A protein has these predicted regions:
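C-terminal accessory region of radical SAM enzymes
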Residues: 98-131, 162-210
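Short acidic, glycine/proline-enriched helix-loop-strand junctions
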Residues: 14, 21-32, 44-51, 84-121
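Basic/polar, acidic-poor N-terminal "presequence/leader" segments
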Residues: 53, 133-134
Length: 254
């Protein structure tokens, strides 16, 4: 497999808080050594990402990213949790200042480490200012329902993993004698590009964000063409930080 995603929520205390075992003990000490072994034995031409999650319980998530790097994981990603506000761990609009502060803090440390030759990759700070992806990827970055599908253990087909269980978006089953993905659904996803979304059309970040997550738009706004606001604001901050890192590398690098 060309790419694997290794899911570990963050530092030991962060991971064990969100991911206890069935006997209510922490899972970090079970999982982390296995991930390290996989990475150490993985061919250099194959990719991996260690993927964490930040919630209201670890808004200091820059520490989780640096923890991954210090543990030897050089390809990292830490994603914001997505959940309804009544969930105690869900992010809220009032958390944005702290989230922005953490991205800025991480960006400075990230750039400094790269300049010292001890760098690593953080998925959300990877940006190509010279060329970047093709125009199709720029206007609709999510391939759900067309380039990407999720298959459940029972064989049900959905546009992506976030739609699993939503019967309105069930596309079929791999055990069906003939599989024809419903055009009304696949076309809806295909047509949900940045020029079809009022909030995106005049946004400075649209060609780096590419319209955001379709599932979040539907789950929070019941409309695939109305982006998830918290996601938009965090993506703008990540782009700003990515540009700052590029500028710092150009000005201070060799």
């Amino acid at each position: 497999m060309h790419n694997v995603v290794l899911s570990l929520d963050g530092r030991k205390e962060v991971n064990d808080n969100m991911r206890p075992t069935v006997n209510n003990k922490g899972s970090y000490d079970i999982i982390a050594p296995k991930f390290k072994k996989l990475v150490s034995e993985r061919p250099k031409d194959k990719y991996y990402y260690i993927r964490g999650t930040f919630t209201r319980d670890n808004l200091d998530f820059s520490e989780d990213v640096l923890h991954f790097a210090n543990e030897g994981f050089k390809l990292t990603s830490v994603e914001p949790v997505v959940g309804e506000e009544e969930n105690p761990y869900a992010l809220r609009e009032e958390d944005l200042p702290k989230v922005f502060e953490e991205y800025e803090k991480l960006a400075v440390q990230y750039a400094d480490m790269k300049l010292k030759g001890d760098g690593f990759s953080f998925f959300h700070f990877m940006i190509d200012l010279n060329q970047g992806p093709c125009v199709i990827k720029r206007i609709t970055g999510c391939g759900a329902g067309n380039e990407y599908l999720a298959i459940t253990p029972s064989g049900d087909i959905y546009p992506c993993h976030q739609f699993v269980g939503n019967e309105d978006f069930k596309l079929g089953n791999i055990l069906d004698e003939k599989i024809e993905l419903p055009k009304e659904v696949t076309n809806m996803f295909r047509e949900a590009h940045v020029y079809a979304k009022d909030e995106c059309r005049n946004c400075w970040n649209k060609f780096y964000c590419s319209g955001g997550c379709h599932a979040n738009a539907i789950n929070f706004n019941n409309d695939i063409k109305v982006p998830y606001k918290l996601g938009c604001e965090m993506q703008k901050k990540r782009t700003e930080c990515s540009i700052m890192i590029q500028a710092k590398m150009m000005l201070e690098g060799n």
